[in-house]
Amino acid sequence: VDPEKEFAKAHYEQHMKVTGKLAIDGETYEIDAFGLRDHSWGPRYWQNIYSYRWLTCSFGPALNIMVSEIRPNTESRTEGGVVIRDGVLERIVHLNIDSTFDDDRPFHRSMVADLELESGEHVTVEGRVVGFIPLRNRREGHVTHIGEGMTEYKCLGHTSLGISEYLDQVQ
């Protein structure tokens, strides 16, 4: 990939469990949680891709998901991600995300992701956005819309909160 056309350089994601204590103003809070660390080295170039859909959720020790659909342009896309059950990781080899949006704004409100795993198993993830933050990035005459959704997910009998992040170029 041409470095000038990359979206996020040296990007990685890690599902993890975090334990510890957090002290604020003399109060101590115990932390025992699951989540996902998302990191890129250097700046992101939001205008280098046409769109993406990124869904992530930790349901606890039994289930974690990360779903990614990236469209570098209007003609092509990459798809992937993982489903982790009881510590066993399985790759997503094909996916389809059906999303609903506000009528008058490009804000996503819900989605259904049909996932095909490398084993051939099909898994469905349903999401409903319960909190939304619209963002935008402007560079060299381009406007990019990024929507961050706190999302209630349902998958394989589990329900939990996670993130749905959608990026689209504004024409």
State the predicted function of each range.
Residues V1-Q171:
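Structured soluble/peripheral alpha/beta segments that form catalytic or ligand/cofactor-binding pockets
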